[in-house]
A protein has these predicted regions:
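Bacterial N-terminal signal peptides that target proteins for export
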Residues: 1-9
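Bacterial N-terminal signal peptides
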Residues: 8-18
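Structured extracytoplasmic
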Residues: 23-197, 206-211, 216-234, 240-251, ...
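A residue-level detector for well-ordered beta-strand positions
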Residues: 201-202
Length: 299
């Protein structure tokens, strides 16, 4: 598992709790939105290499909401994650479940689920690579993001830099994105979701990293599979944290889904993932970049 920002993070932000916000003003000079996205992707790729063989905590919380708006069921898990090196897959170990130490059976089940997901990702990656044309000299300017070329991803959106603001003393570009009516017809669930995604991103103007993202679906998206789901609404939020030395680390990712299952059961579920206690290792040296006062759960 890599300590990397979501691929769609290169496309959005704002309105997050605790953010120190200022009035949005027009950019001092014209900024090309697509060039800005490309620069962000290049910057994030360079930064990702700094997190090879890093460790961090990943806290996941899932909440099923009742029709009265109250939490009906809450489940939490804490993982200790070892990031992979380069393109290699990392690994993670289940540490806690609902605030108590995980049992051996729970650890085995989590490991089996991760292995199943890993194999699925490898198969999907292989299929995508088999369909992909050979790399050309322009790959640095049109890299692969996830399983698609950057140009294909941003070609699905109308992207605009709508202003600038200062957040925590740092300048940032405010970038809005919305589905492009002329986007290619979707071929997969991922394409259908992208073709319905709209939101705002805040891009740090110094390091060209994604400070935060807020996005939502503009229309329902049907997902087939083991249990078909009709997602009528989805809200997504992401925040990043500057660490210094041009490095940023994901802080939180939040997702809420509402809709119906194939059996017409009500769906209203939220997910929150928090990342903390990052440690970077270099040969015999260890760098602890946790925020002050956070003791962490990792040994």
């Amino acid at each position: 598992m890599k300590a990397r920002s979501p691929a769609c993070a290169a496309l959005a932000i704002s309105l997050l709790p605790g953010a120190v916000r200022a009035e949005i003003v027009a950019p001092a000079f014209e900024v090309d939105a697509r060039d800005l996205v490309r620069r962000v992707v290049r910057s994030q790729r360079r930064a990702e290499a700094a997190f090879d063989d890093a460790t961090f905590d990943q806290h996941e919380v899932k909440i099923d909401w009742g029709s009265d708006g109250r939490a009906k069921e809450i489940a939490s898990r804490l993982f200790y994650v070892l990031s992979g090196n380069g393109d290699a897959e990392g690994s993670r170990e289940l540490v806690e479940v609902d605030g108590r130490p995980a049992t051996e059976a729970e650890k085995r089940k989590a490991a089996e689920e991760d292995e199943k997901d890993r194999k699925k990702r490898l198969v999907e990656k292989g299929v995508a690579e088999a369909r992909r044309a050979e790399k050309v000299s322009g790959d640095e300017d049109d890299p692969i993001v996830g399983r698609k070329r950057l140009s294909e991803l941003i070609g699905r959106f109308v992207i605009r830099v709508v202003g600038e603001e200062v957040v925590e003393g740092r300048p940032a570009y405010v970038l809005d994105f919305a589905p492009d009516p002329a986007a290619p017809a979707p071929k997969s669930l991922g394409d259908r979701a992208l073709n319905a995604l709209s939101g705002r991103a805040l891009i740090d103007a110094v390091d060209f990293q994604v400070r935060s993202v807020v996005a939502h679906l503009t229309k329902p998206v049907k997902a087939a599979g083991g249990l078909a789901v009709n997602v009528k609404a989805a809200e997504i939020a992401y925040t990043g944290q500057p660490l210094g030395e041009n490095l940023w680390f994901p802080c939180t990712v939040e997702l809420r889904l509402t809709g119906k299952t194939a059996l017409f059961f009500r769906l209203d579920t939220s997910f929150r993932i928090e990342f903390a206690n990052l440690k970077r290792f270099r040969v015999d040296a260890e760098s602890d970049v946790r925020p002050a006062g956070n003791p962490g759960s990792a040994p």
